[in-house]
Amino acid sequence: LRERVIAAGQELFHKRGIRAVTMDDVSHQLHISKRTLYQLFDTKESLLLACQQKAMAEHQQQIEHIMAETDNVIEIILSDLQLSMMEIQKFSKEFLNEIPLYDKLRENMLHHRKENKANALEFINRGISQGLFRPEINAEMVYEVGVAIIDTLVEKGLYKTVPLFEL
């Protein structure tokens, strides 16, 4: 039941935004009582965190699958970018704009980015050793620029106007 609640929460939050969705909406969607829902998640924010953690875990699984199929760093990075953009396109503008308003969501996302930074730097350094990137590049700066590009695409809503194959 917990997984069904998380899936319903993801669908509603992504489609309508965080503020527009109530715990009542989630319970109605699943045809369960609010009491049952609150036994699983004591607050809307705890449900939001569970939804976010599930999405991050699924993304990580997909990246690990891609990494198992290829050693080419460029393919992995482009696949990750394409996967991220496809995921972001599922979100309403309201949802994306409201994420920063929730401290725990924002903190969780920053923590996730910090964890992934080490992996990203490893990919960049592997690309250097594979001869795919110039040896004098600053891996940290490349990572920060990549993050800034994604943030800008999201912030300005450009992810909806730029075809994926052009990214």
Per-range role (PLM):
Residues L96-I99, S129-L167:
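Hydrophobic/aromatic-rich alpha-helical bundle segments in the mid-to-C-terminal region
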Residues A8, L12, T36, L83, ...:
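Amphipathic alpha-helical interface segments
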Residues I6, L78, K117-N125, A139-Y143, ...:
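An amphipathic alpha-helix signature
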Residues A50, K54, Q61-K90, Y143-G146:
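Hydrophobic alpha-helical connector segments
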Residues K15-R19, T70, Q130:
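Short coil/turn segments at alpha/beta junctions that flank glycine-rich nucleotide-binding fingerprints
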Residues L83-E122, S129-L132, E140-M141:
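Short secondary-structure transition hinges
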Residues R2, I6, L48, Q52, ...:
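Amphipathic, non-transmembrane alpha-helical scaffold segments
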Residues R4, A8, L12-S46, A50:
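Helix-turn-helix
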